[in-house]
Amino acid sequence: MASKKPMTKKATATKSASKKKTAEAVAQPVEKVVVEEEMVEVIDTTTKECARTSLLPGDLINIVITELVGTFILTLVALSTGYFNFAPFYVGLTLTVMVLAIGAVSGSHINPAVTFGLWSMRKLKTALVPFYWAAQFLGAMSAVVLLNVLSNNTFSLSFDSFMSFSWGIFAIELVGAAVFMFGLAAVLSRQEVKPSGKAVGIGMSLTIGLLVAGTLLAPVQNGAYKAARGGVQSGTIDQNKQHALPHELYVSGATLNPAVALAATEKTDSQLKNGAAAPAEGEKNYSRLSLEVITATLIGAALGGNLFLLVNYRSKAEKLAN
């Protein structure tokens, strides 16, 4: 057997260099893969961060459309059932159906006061508020246009009462909106409740808010009626005013919703005095949208929502302390 010749220094150096090149060749693809993975991770992180910090969502058009349609339907139901005893239940049931139908898309606010309340609770981005409000008021206006067309242009609205302000009406709208928003915030906080259960809870919250406001309206109107009767007897009532009687007497119920208030109307003199079903010829239909309704519902919604946050926070703090 032939013996192996010892390797020369030159051969040894050549072999070492070859091994080094091979190791570098293997290391380069590995390093390249690591760098590419890091770049992909950075890009993904940046994309997610941009999506999270984006002011407007990608489905903004869907939100606007669903809010418009939802407010349109709610307004029609509120107007058609406004003079029925069970109107709060009909309106609450309608809201329940709307939450089930469009809640997953826009949250089914269909009420500028709810949008403002959620914004005050930091549950809604500021940039979205104008879009919600625009869609909601457009929905209510669409209901007015439809009713005007169907009634042969007799359902025209007058906004001469927009600047009117009654502390009594302000109070009932504020309390009703606060009760409604308190219940809504409580329902939304219950993560274990199914969507159908939340829809029922939100609808019932609106029903209870309307019932509470309606209960408060009765003493307000009684006080206004007594004051008006005393004014008639003493001759201090101005018969040439826009309303011959106190403003509170022309209101048939609370709205708790500025968009619905835009389409809702006050009673006319003939309806109030003679119990007529429709306004007399030449009488104006005064819109319920006024400073008292707008300010009361917005403030009430903010108070109700944030009051629940306060109560819920204190409750959790006490549980942790115990």
List PLM regions with ranges.
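Membrane-interface helix-loop junctions and terminal tails of multi-pass membrane proteins
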Residues: 2-322
